[in-house]
A protein has these predicted regions:
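Membrane-integral, polyisoprenol-dependent glycosyltransferases
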Residues: 1-213
C-alpha cells in the first residue's frame, strides 16, 4: 500500500468512524428489534448459556446466535447499555467499508476503491443499520467478505465467510453468495473455477463451522 492509498484509507476511516460511532449510545433502544437483541445477549451473560438464546427466561431460536454473541462480548467490555448493544453493528459496518476499500483498490485502483467505499459509507440505509442493534451489518460484512474472497480467489476464506454469515442469519448466508457466484460462472463460462474452488471440501468446511449450532 503506497502513501496515497494509506492517506485515502485514513481519511475514509475518520469519516466512517465519525459517521457510525458518534452518538451511538445517545438514544434508547428502539422497538421492535433492538431491545430483543440486547435482552437476549444480556440473558446469555446472566444464565451463562451462550448456546441456547432466550428472552425473558424463555428459549427462542428466531435467529442464529452470532449477533447475540457479539453483543454479549461488547457488554462484558462496555457494560449493559445502548452503546454495547449497538457497538457490534457499528464495528461491522466500519469494517465492511474498510474491507471494500482495500479489496476494490487491489482489484482496480485507489480511486475506484475510495469512491466505492465512500458511497457505501454515506448511504442512508447503511448509516441507519450501522447505528442499530440489528443483525444486518454483521450479515453484510460476511456476505461481502465471501464475494470479495471469491474475486480474489481466496476460496477457503470464502467458505468460512459463508459459514459465519449462516451463523448470523441462517441459510441466506450460503444461498445468496452461492447464487451470485454460480451466475457469474454461468455468464462468464469459467467452469474451471468449480474445480479450483474445491467445492466438496469447501462445503465440508462450511458445515463444520455452521452446522453445530
Amino acid at each position: 500500500m503506497n502513501r496515497i492509498e494509506k492517506g485515502s484509507l485514513l481519511v475514509l476511516a475518520i469519516i466512517v468512524a465519525f459517521n457510525i460511532f458518534f452518538g451511538l449510545g445517545s438514544i434508547p433502544l428502539l422497538d421492535p428489534d433492538e431491545p430483543v437483541y440486547a435482552e437476549t445477549a444480556r440473558e446469555m451473560i446472566q444464565f451463562n448459556d451462550y448456546l441456547s438464546p432466550r428472552i425473558y427466561n424463555e428459549y427462542w431460536f428466531d435467529k442464529p446466535p452470532m449477533y447475540y454473541w457479539l453483543v454479549a462480548g461488547a457488554m462484558h467490555v462496555f457494560g449493559d447499555g445502548e452503546f454495547a448493544a449497538r457497538f457490534p453493528a457499528a464495528l461491522m459496518a466500519f469494517s465492511t467499508v474498510i474491507m471494500l476499500y482495500c479489496s476494490i483498490t487491489r482489484l482496480f485502483n485507489e480511486r475506484a476503491g475510495f469512491w466505492s467505499a465512500l458511497v457505501l459509507a454515506t448511504s442512508v440505509q447503511f448509516f441507519y443499520l450501522g447505528k442499530a442493534a440489528v443483525t444486518d451489518t454483521t450479515l453484510l460484512f460476511f456476505l461481502t467478505g465471501s464475494l470479495l474472497c471469491y474475486l480474489h480467489k481466496q476460496y477457503w476464506l470464502m467458505y468460512v465467510c459463508m459459514a459465519l454469515a449462516t451463523v448470523t442469519k441462517g441459510p441466506i448466508g450460503i444461498v445468496f453468495p452461492g447464487a451470485i457466484i454460480f451466475l457469474h460462472i454461468l455468464c462468464t463460462g469459467q467452469w474451471q473455477k468449480l474445480f479450483k474452488m474445491h467445492c466438496l471440501r469447501g462445503l465440508l468446511l462450511y458445515f463444520f463451522i455452521a452446522a453445530p449450532w
